[in-house]
């Protein structure tokens, strides 16, 4: 248990049977009345962000979480099999717990966040940017660079990304895994 005044960014708490990460906090001391903490909490499972006020003396249940590197090995049914890079144990992780799963390649290393007391996986984070080779895209026409037009391109993971017209097959591009958007071309 922690006091509400001890909440900081990244603190994980259990409230109403759900786990929340603090993503923003503010210690408020009004001229009149009691001091309180104004927080923004992100639901670990759904990603829903809510604002919540806590009185300074209020007790909260904190949850200790661990972030460890895991390597993706293969897909088995709906589960993805990962290997803990420290203990070499293999663990299945459900599809919906992996952020940016469309850009997952064999051998990729992800940060897996789990509850330290129960060892249950909360979620797995892809790196924010990944580099992938374009496996298929329509050829661009010469002189089609006047406008900021995008075309679909398939990358090596099988995902489709909208890219500028000058990108051709075989080129390596950088992709933002949060929204699947094109970031730039990677120089060889």
Curated annotation (Swiss-Prot):
One of its GO terms (cellular component) is cytoplasm. GO terms for molecular function: translation elongation factor activity. One of its GO terms (biological process) is peptide biosynthetic process. The keyword Cytoplasm applies. Pfam families: EFP, EFP_N, Elong-fact-P_C. Its main location: cytoplasm. InterPro entries: Elong-fact-P_C, NA-bd_OB-fold, Rib_uL2_dom2, Transl_elong_fac_P/YeiP, Transl_elong_KOW-like, Transl_elong_P/YeiP_cen, Transl_elong_P/YeiP_CS, Transl_elongation_fac_P. Transmembrane segments: none annotated. Keywords: Cytoplasm, Elongation factor, Protein biosynthesis. It comes from the Bacteria. It is found in: Cytoplasm. Disulfide bonds: none annotated. Gene3D superfamilies: 2.30.30.30, Nucleic acid-binding proteins. Pathway: Protein biosynthesis; polypeptide chain elongation. Belongs to the elongation factor P family. Involved in peptide bond synthesis. Stimulates efficient translation and peptide-bond synthesis on native or reconstituted 70S ribosomes in vitro. Probably functions indirectly by altering the affinity of the ribosome for aminoacyl-tRNA, thus increasing their reactivity as acceptors for peptidyl transferase. This is Elongation factor P. It comes from Bacteroides thetaiotaomicron (strain ATCC 29148 / DSM 2079 / JCM 5827 / CCUG 10774 / NCTC 10582 / VPI-5482 / E50).
């Amino acid at each position: 248990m922690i006091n509400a005044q001890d909440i900081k960014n990244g603190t994980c708490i259990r409230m109403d049977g759900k786990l929340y990460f603090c993503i923003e906090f503010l210690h408020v001391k009004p001229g009149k009345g009691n001091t309180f903490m104004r927080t923004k909490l992100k639901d670990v499972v759904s990603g829903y962000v809510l604002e919540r006020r806590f009185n300074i003396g209020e007790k909260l249940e904190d949850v200790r979480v661990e972030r460890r590197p895991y390597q993706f090995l293969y897909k088995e049914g709906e589960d993805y099999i990962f290997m803990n890079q420290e203990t070499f144990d293999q663990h299945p992780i459900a599809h919906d717990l992996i952020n940016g799963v469309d850009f997952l390649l064999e051998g990729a290393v992800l940060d897996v966040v789990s509850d330290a007391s129960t060892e249950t996986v909360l979620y797995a984070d892809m790196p924010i940017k990944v580099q992938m080779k374009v496996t298929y895209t329509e050829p661009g026409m010469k002189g089609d660079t006047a406008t900021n037009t995008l075309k679909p391109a398939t990358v090596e993971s099988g995902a489709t990304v909208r890219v500028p017209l000058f990108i051709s097959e075989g080129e390596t591009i950088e992709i933002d895994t949060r929204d699947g958007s094109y970031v730039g071309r990677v120089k060889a």
